[in-house]
Design a protein with these regions (language model features):
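Pyridoxal 5′-phosphate
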Residues: 1-384
Length: 384
């Protein structure tokens, strides 16, 4: 149908896979027990939890004991950064990150600065890439952690983590990566990436909201974020969300199993989308690296554009998209990521993020390519 809704905001969240829901249902009904108990229903819940932990670990190339289940990516980022810094227990501990991180990382670093932690937010180039040489140059004797995302949530750029990890390892500094956007889309084996801590979130790969995980390499100095019971081997207090965790593991298995074929399909659709929009809309610009980016990510800037007006126009035509910016008080603030790329505030505020997913079709891409030039023209700001 020509008027069927088009969902192009998969970087924000993905629909729950029906097969994932099916895997979760027993743990919402018959296997409802608390996994810390000793009776039958509790044992069933514990078995589901253990199987999920083993499955996630195998997918990441990790040990089951290195997986901590959380409520999602933001908690995992907080736990990773605060846990390593607290374990360092050093006055003036130093954290290296980048200027384009998710706010779960940037705001955590900012919060730690209130307690004497020092942070270096490295710049990126005009395509959003971090220079490993700048990582090396930023290291101090007090550097306790390097936290650099695997793939950016706005522009999809994939960072050279293997090079960065070699630098971190040579200096004996733990490396954390926010892999919330990349897990399930591109390979994320922890040894290949060379990371010591990795954050992920189920709802980014067709799993349930409210379920995430943190990988912590054995031997990494780290303290838990919250205290209470002895769940997660004493590393994350609170009764586990068993149904959500089972769903996370099932969604990850399904995403990784189809990753190669789906990645190729999405790249072809994405490249067609990018080429069509750049050709049809004068002044349009692709944000991010042309090739080192997630398969389904396309982010554009349009000069002299009212970004909020464009999003509302798209919504009225049945297209769900995003600016990649924080919406506050009825206006769209310029993206901190695009400002870090050197875009001026007008271009940063006139951004459009289109993120494709498992159900995106070539027909939908054609419809957006036909629709967008008209809507961009209508959303242009009046010349002064």
């Amino acid at each position: 149908m020509d008027d069927a809704p088009i969902y192009l905001d998969h970087a924000a969240t993905t629909p729950l896979d029906p097969r994932v829901l099916e895997s979760m249902l027993p743990y919402l009904t018959s296997h409802f027990g608390n996994p810390s108990g000793l009776y039958g229903a509790a044992r069933s819940a514990r078995q589901g939890l253990d199987r999920a932990r083993g499955s996630v670990a195998a997918t990441l190339g990790a040990k089951a004991s290195e997986i901590i289940f959380t409520s999602g990516g933001s908690e995992s980022d907080n736990a990773a950064i605060k846990g390593v810094v607290w374990a360092a227990n050093a006055p003036g501990a130093h954290v290296i990150t980048t200027s384009i991180e998710h706010h779960a990382v940037l705001h955590t670093c900012g919060w730690l600065e209130r307690f004497g932690v020092e942070t270096t937010a490295l710049p990126v180039d005009s395509e959003g890439m971090v220079d490993p040489a700048q990582v090396a140059a930023a290291i101090r004797p007090t550097t306790a952690l390097i936290s650099i995302m695997h793939a950016n949530n706005e522009i999809g750029v994939i960072q050279p983590l293997a090079e960065i990890s070699a630098i971190a390892r040579a200096h004996g500094i733990p490396l954390h990566t926010d892999a919330v956007q990349s897990v399930g889309q591109v390979p994320t084996l922890v040894d290949s990436l060379g990371v010591d801590l990795l954050s992920l979130s189920a709802h980014k790969f067709y799993g349930p909201k409210g379920a995430g995980a943190l990988y912590v390499r054995r031997g990494t100095p780290w303290l838990p974020l919250q205290q209470g019971g002895g769940q997660e081997r004493g590393r994350r207090a609170g009764t586990e969300n068993v149904a959500g965790i089972v769903g996370l593991a099932a969604a990850l298995d399904l995403s990784v199993a189809g990753m190669e074929n789906e990645g190729s399909r999405l790249r072809a659709l994405r490249d067609d989308l990018i080429a069509g929009i750049l050709a049809a809309i004068p002044g349009s610009r692709l944000n991010g690296h042309p090739t080192a980016r997630l398969p389904g990510n396309a982010n554009f800037s349009f000069p002299d554009l009212d970004g909020e007006a464009l999003l509302l126009s798209l919504d009225r035509r049945g297209v769900a998209a995003s600016s990649g910016s924080a919406c506050t008080a009825g206006s769209i603030d310029p993206s901190h990521v695009l400002l870090a790329l050197g875009r001026d505030r007008t271009l940063a505020a006139g951004a459009l993020r289109l993120t494709l997913g498992r159900h995106t079709t070539a027909d939908e891409i054609d419809r957006v390519q036909t629709l967008l030039p008209e809507l961009v023209a209508r959303a242009r700001l009046p010349s002064l």
